[in-house]
């Protein structure tokens, strides 16, 4: 969900990224169960999508349309992963995108851990909070790595397709 929220924020704007992240959490919890954690999940994934939009607006992430000429000339087909792009600045932007994917797993974990510490650590002490956060760290790292891998594979093809739909139907999201 984090990668999808980041891609939505980068292609459709920060507000759309927030909505995709928040509504993805709400919709998934209809299947997996709503609970007191649901608003925290909605906020965390919404925040990740929003930050994805902010960073894309600042030019930190690769612009999928920048490789259009490269794609038209027959190199690296339309669905080639982001890592196969040419250009030093685009590679640097791809590295920043992957780094944000890694950090987004930790950011999501921080928000959810705040809920967990406030809701479950009794008595609320600093050692108890540290133990709670330390226990969740492996899951947060796996979440970040998975988000980075999904961004590496899906960012370019999805942004190209979303940009095509936005152009075709004259969608105004920003």
Region annotations inferred by a language model:
Residues 19-22, 154:
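Short hydrophobic alpha-helical segments that form membrane-spanning helices or hydrophobic packing faces
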Residues 22-58:
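Interfacial aromatic-anchored transmembrane helix boundaries in multi-pass membrane proteins
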Residues 35-39, 54, 58-63, 81-174:
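Membrane-embedded alpha-helical hairpins and interfacial helices in multi-pass inner-membrane proteins
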């Amino acid at each position: 969900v984090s990668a999808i929220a980041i891609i939505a924020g980068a292609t459709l704007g920060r507000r759309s990224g927030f909505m995709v992240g928040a509504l993805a959490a709400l919709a998934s919890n209809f299947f997996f169960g709503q609970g007191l954690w649901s608003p925290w999940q909605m906020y965390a994934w919404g925040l990740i999508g929003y930050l994805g939009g902010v960073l894309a607006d600042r030019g930190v992430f690769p612009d999928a349309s920048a490789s259009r000429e490269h794609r038209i000339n027959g190199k690296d087909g339309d669905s080639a992963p982001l890592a196969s792009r040419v250009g030093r600045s685009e590679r640097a932007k791809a590295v920043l995108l992957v780094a944000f994917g890694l950090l987004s797993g930790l950011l999501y974990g921080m928000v959810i851990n705040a809920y967990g510490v406030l809701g479950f650590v009794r008595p609320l002490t600093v050692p108890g909070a540290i133990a709670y956060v330390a226990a969740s760290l492996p899951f947060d790292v796996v979440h970040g790595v998975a988000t980075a891998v999904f961004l590496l594979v899906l960012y370019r093809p999805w942004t190209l397709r979303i940009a095509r739909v936005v152009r075709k139907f004259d969608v105004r999201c920003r």
